[in-house]
Swiss-Prot record:
Lineage: Bacteria, Pseudomonadati, Pseudomonadota, Betaproteobacteria, Burkholderiales
The protein, known as: Hopanoid transporter HpnN
Gene disruption phenotype: Deletion mutant cannot grow in the presence of various antibiotics, including chloramphenicol, novobiocin and polymyxin B.
Name of the gene this protein is made from: hpnN
All ranges on the Periplasmic side of the membrane: 38-275, 322-326, 394-404, 478-718, 770-774, 829-839
Effect of T818A: Growth is severely attenuated in the presence of chloramphenicol, novobiocin or polymyxin B
Summary of the function given for this chain in its UniProt record: Essential for hopanoid transport from the cytoplasmic to the outer membrane. Is capable of shuttling hopanoid lipids from the inner membrane to the periplasm, where they probably spontaneously insert to the inner leaflet of the outer membrane, strengthening the cell envelope. May be a proton-motive-force (PMF)-dependent transporter. Is critical for multidrug resistance and cell wall remodeling in Burkholderia.
Organism listed in the record: Burkholderia thailandensis (strain ATCC 700388 / DSM 13276 / CCUG 48851 / CIP 106301 / E264)
Effect of L826F: Growth is severely attenuated in the presence of chloramphenicol, novobiocin or polymyxin B
Family of the protein in this entry: Belongs to the resistance-nodulation-cell division (RND) (TC 2.A.6) family. MmpL subfamily.
UniProt keyword terms in alphabetical order: Cell inner membrane, Cell membrane, Lipid transport, Membrane, Transmembrane, Transmembrane helix, Transport
Oligomer status and interactors: Homodimer.
Length: 877
């Protein structure tokens, strides 16, 4: 009955082709207008997964209490010396605060910097370290006095010359003890002479951490985001870069600003999806055209297929927007799905039309005959594919759920246009007759071989597949979303460079406590866990033993501040500067000769470098002046501020810091960082799993970082298992209702399941873990696989033999080729997640195709001999 309805629909379309084409184009035009006015993409990835209310409440509570902490941008200021990095970060933060006042960005802060740490930084050291540091500074008072009096390069050269005189000769100083100073000075002068960015860090002489290159300082910015744009935080990033450029941080400090954090990572991820999309799209279209030409052998038929696809795609887009309101970053893939499966329907009908046209030259008879042969298989395939997509509707993975809804509806649109618009267009375009039927007659011997050796092939295949099942125990899900991002993008490269830095805090988790006292108690409990490296609350910013530390610092300040605050000497002429450099060079040469051993090579090197600097032009010496004198002035000023701290209390903490850790209603935040063993990878999955499990067990209210990622991974895996089970059940019921034979249902499902199992087994063998991106490939291939299996079982039920050489295999192979081209183009994407999806799709499609073309005919065997029976038959059997 259904076949006759479909045949009448095609016959009506063939008799009234102009009406059908006009109505289709009108529907496409109206749909296009709707899409143009309502097209929206929501790039907020937090909306892709629906968490259970209890879990969602934890995240919402922190977001509501501390909205400034979400989707932040971390501006990483890199400079040749920590003095320059700190000064550049301060300048950038001041400039960005003016932008925040204008409303272009949100809150601006300096992690580990700003006035609090500039004045009171020494108070955060342990009491013994404060005593040691101030004692060292006091003993260096004569040197500090000389440096502060004349911090110019001439003054530094003179100080060096003085040191190389009596102090060295009397043994007060040793050349070996000056080795670090001399070698670093020589390296800085060499950079100046080579025209490279150069700065001499005075902090690096006494602080090993400050010696790391490049030196970094940080500014955190809360962006004003627009989730209607592909790159929601792009405007904020532009503001930061423009501010840095306007402040001339590069010229003043040799500083560069790189952006990372949640928002830049998301923005660059979406940008990488776009990157190369046009070229890939054009290449994909060209390859699809070639494949269609080989499959259909007619420009008119190809034109008809493209028009049919375009109309169906526009109508599906309009229906999708009506149903979901706005697309998300996953549901937008419905276009690739529609093209891949829509082309399949068109090729199946078109190839069958070619076969019918070879038998009967009459165009209308061939079009109706193709509908009689393919109407039922196409309808069953559509229903099965749609069922596989609709199986995601009840799951918590909203991104794929909406994709399934749109793609499932799109399959019915594709079927309707294939059975109405495509025949009407072919009737109007009137392709020429077919000289030979489509198919692969050369594969007849393969058909015969498979038929004769059916049982050994079947047993061998199943033995290998079943024998490899233990591999599935090693199938891995990579839950770290950072592995899906382009490591060469600025935001990701910067984040990787910061993997050992607490400012990145990628793997930190958070706990919202009812009060600061409760937060401190929780921090103490969590800090005792072996998996936890550090806990932070507002109380972390209130140092202990402050009276003792303040007294120690005050004693040092009484000795050092007069030297640090004295007026600097007047600048000298360039001639005097040259003379000072030459004298220092000569004395270094003598010292290297007179005191061989450690430090002699560095002295010789610096002697040669200073001689070259003295012989260079005045502009080069000005750059050397900036490289040595500017960091020294900054360092001396920083030291003067550090020697004038004031007691830190809860009341006088900067309001911005308080707001970052305590909400207006009194609730307080605890930040917990994992303990990373020395030399270990901070992103190690096993370590993060242990950390997340331990912290969650100790404090069930913790959320964020690896805890949230693991929860999302569990939710997504559950969604896919639920959808897979629902899909198999719904497809089984659909096939049973349609085919009415349990054996035929198994002949359809077993090859599908075998293809899926083999795909996962090969993932293990090829080292391809599943992840948040490529797992989406599995339901896509389930849909394609169901369609292929349905075509073959319907042909087998109709009594067709020699399936490999048939027009059906011709259609399936070229349909798979177009689908592989559409999906495989993802493999070429610059986005690692999209590329991994393309790889898995290519693998899954290969397994699906082999399962349909080779394994399924072997499983089915020879067609049944039809006989008169009272058994209830399947639809149109």
């Amino acid at each position: 009955m259904l076949t006759s309805v479909l045949v009448r629909l095609v016959a009506w379309s063939v008799r009234r082709p102009i009406w059908v084409v006009v109505l289709s184009l009108v529907a496409a035009a109206l749909s296009g207008v709707y899409v143009a006015h309502h097209f929206k993409i929501n790039t907020d990835i937090s909306k892709l997964v629906e968490n259970d209310p209890k879990w969602a409440a934890l995240g919402h509570a922190i977001d509501d209490a501390f909205p400034q902490r979400s989707q932040t941008i971390l501006a990483v200021v890199e400079a040749p010396a920590p003095e320059f990095a700190a000064a550049a970060a301060n300048a950038l933060a001041d400039g960005l605060r003016r932008e925040a006042e204008a409303g272009r960005i949100g809150q601006v802060s300096e992690p580990g910097g700003g006035p609090l740490f500039e004045h009171d930084g020494l108070l955060f050291l342990p009491e013994q370290d404060v005593a040691t540091t101030t004692a060292q500074l006091a003993s260096a008072r004569p040197l500090i006095n000389v440096l502060a009096k004349d911090p110019s390069i001439a003054g530094l050269a003179t100080t060096l010359s003085t040191t190389l005189g009596v102090p060295l000769q009397s043994g007060q100083v040793k050349l070996s003890g000056m080795a670090k100073l001399l070698s670093r000075s020589a390296a800085t002068v060499d950079d100046v002479l080579a025209g490279k960015p150069a700065a001499f860090s005075w902090r690096a002489l006494v602080d090993a951490d400050a010696a790391r290159e490049p030196a970094r300082a940080f500014v955190t910015v809360q962006p004003v985001v627009n989730y209607g744009a592909l790159q929601a935080g792009e405007q904020a990033s532009r503001t930061i870069r423009a501010t840095a450029q306007a402040l001339k941080l590069d010229e003043r400090f040799g500083a560069a600003v790189r952006l990372t954090g949640e928002q830049p990572l998301a923005d660059e991820e979406f940008a990488s999806v776009q990157d190369g999309a046009l070229v890939n799209g054009i290449a994909t279209l060209a390859i699809v055209l070639v494949i269609l030409w080989i499959a259909l052998r007619s420009k008119r038929m190809i034109a008809a297929v493209f028009v049919t696809l375009f109309v169906g795609l526009v109508v599906t887009a309009a229906l999708g927007l009506m149903m979901v309101g706005s697309l998300n970053m996953i549901s937008v893939a419905f276009m690739v799905l529609f093209v891949g499966l829509g082309v399949d329907f068109a090729i199946q009908y078109g190839v069958k039309y070619r076969e019918e046209r070879h038998r009967d030259p009459n165009l209308e008879h061939a079009l109706v005959g193709a509908a009689h042969a393919m109407g039922m298989p196409l309808t069953l395939a559509t229903a099965a594919v749609a069922a596989s997509f609709f199986s995601f509707l009840p799951t918590a993975y909203r991104g794929v759920s909406e994709l399934g809804l749109i793609a499932g509806v799109g399959m019915f649109v594709a079927l309707f246009t294939t059975l109405t618009l495509l025949p009407a267009l072919l009737r109007l375009l009137a392709p020429p007759g077919e000289r030979k039927p489509p198919g692969f007659p050369r594969l007849a011997p393969v058909d015969d071989y498979l038929d004769r050796h059916r049982k050994p092939i079947l047993i061998g295949t199943l033995a290998v597949v079943i024998g490899a099942l233990p591999l599935l125990a090693h199938l891995r899900f990579d839950f770290n979303p950072l592995h899906l991002k382009d490591p060469h993008s600025e935001s990701m490269a910067t984040l990787l460079a910061l993997k050992d830095s607490p400012e990145a805090s990628v793997n930190d988790v958070s706990l919202l406590a009812p009060s600061l006292a409760a937060a401190n108690a929780a921090a103490q409990r969590l800090g005792a866990l072996p998996e936890v490296g550090r806990t932070t609350t507002l109380s972390t910013f209130i140092p202990d033993a402050q009276p003792q530390k303040l007294a120690t610092i005050a004693a040092a300040a009484r000795e050092l501040l007069p030297a640090l605050t004295q007026p600097a000497a007047a600048p000298v002429s360039d001639a005097q500067r040259v003379a000072a450099l030459k004298r220092a060079s000569n004395l270094l040469e003598y010292a290297a000769e007179d005191y061989p051993g450690p430090g002699a090579a560095a002295a010789k090197h610096l002697s040669e470098s200073l001689a070259k600097l003295a012989a260079a032009d005045a502009a080069t010496r000005e750059r050397a002046e900036h490289a040595f004198s500017a960091p020294l002035k900054i360092a001396l000023n920083q030291l003067a501020m550090l020697l004038q701290p004031s007691e830190i209390t809860r009341k006088n903490l900067p309001p911005q810091i308080v707001r970052d850790w305590v909400a207006p209603d009194g609730r307080a935040l605890v930040q917990i960082s994992p303990k990373v063993p020395k030399g270990a990878d901070p992103g190690d999955d096993a370590m993060l799993r242990r950390f997340a499990k331990a912290v969650k067990a100790a404090e069930p209210g913790t959320i964020g970082g690896p805890i949230s990622i693991l929860h999302s991974a569990d939710t997504i895996i559950r969604a896919f298992l639920q959808a897979a089970a629902l899909s198999v059940v719904s497809i089984t019921v659909l096939l049973w209702i349609t085919l009415r034979r349990f054996g035929d249902v198994l002949r359809t499902l077993v090859p599908l399941l075998v293809s899926g199992v083999v795909t996962l087994e090969l993932c293990v063998l090829l080292g391809m873990p599943l992840n948040f991106a490529n797992i989406i490939a599995l339901p896509l291939m389930l849909g394609v696989g169901v369609a292929f299996k349905v075509y073959f079982v319907m042909a087998w039920r109709a009594g067709q033999t020699g399936l490999l050489q048939s027009s059906l295999t011709h259609a399936v192979l070229f349909s798979a080729a177009t689908t592989a081209t559409a999906f495989g183009s993802l493999w070429l994407s610059h986005h690692p997640g999209t590329a991994s999806m393309g790889r898995l799709l290519a693998l899954a499609l290969s397994c699906t195709l082999i399962g349909a073309v080779v394994f399924q005919p072997v499983l089915m065997g020879k067609p049944r001999t039809k006989r008169v029976t009272n058994q209830s038959q399947g639809i149109d059997e």
